[in-house]
Each structure stands twice: as C-alpha cells, then as structure tokens.
Amino acid sequence: QSIIRKLILVSKGTNISVDNNYVVRPTSIKVYIEVVKYLVSQGANIRADNDCAVRFASRNGHLEVVKYLVSLGANIRADNDCAVRWASRNGHLDVVEYLVSLGAVLS
C-alpha cells in the first residue's frame, strides 16, 4: 500500500496496530520522518516485532528516523545488534557511529 493510502486508512479509523505495526516499517525505509511521527502520534508501536522499525531505518541509512525512534525508546541492541550490523554492511557510517555512541556493539 502507498503511504498516502495508509494515512487515509488511519484517518478513517483503521487500526494501525495490526500485523505487528507493519505500517511503521515501510515509512522508516523511505525516510518519511513526518509520516513516522504522524503514525506514532496515532498510536503506532515503534518497538513492535523486536524493534524492526529502527533496524530498517538503520539498514537504509536514515539517521534522522533512527534518532527519532531512539528518542522514543527503540532498542538499538535488539536482535543481537542487528541495526548497527545492517548500517555497517550498507556503508552508513553516520548511523554506525551514532549507534555505537549509544552502546551498540559492532562485531
């Protein structure tokens, strides 16, 4: 589904918490920080599915989204430090440095 369609569904009362809060993941991938903020304001759980949102944002190098999710309590060490490993594999040094500065372990 497109981001616009998801927002329309949310505005019409669709439950955004279904399917492990999957709606937060695609927006994190596409770095729509304002959309992520909106979804969170509507009750999306950024910690769903073992903090998948912060892992996807890290994998794609979206530092602003990563910082926002961390500010809301995302666990950067979830899934054995997957976020920092994905950021490293994809060459996102700024994300790697940020996550390591917060205690993520790159091994």
From Swiss-Prot:
Can you say where the ANK repeats lie in this chain?
Answer: 19-48, 49-78, 80-107
SUPFAM superfamilies named in the record: Ankyrin repeat
**Any keyword Manganese?**
no
Q: Which domain of life is it from?
A: Viruses
Q: Which InterPro entries match?
A: Ankyrin_rpt, Ankyrin_rpt-contain_sf
| Keywords annotated in UniProt | ANK repeat, Repeat
Q: Which Gene3D superfamilies match?
A: Ankyrin repeat-containing domain
PANTHER family associated with the record: ANKYRIN REPEAT PROTEIN, GH09064P
Protein name (record): Putative ankyrin repeat protein L14
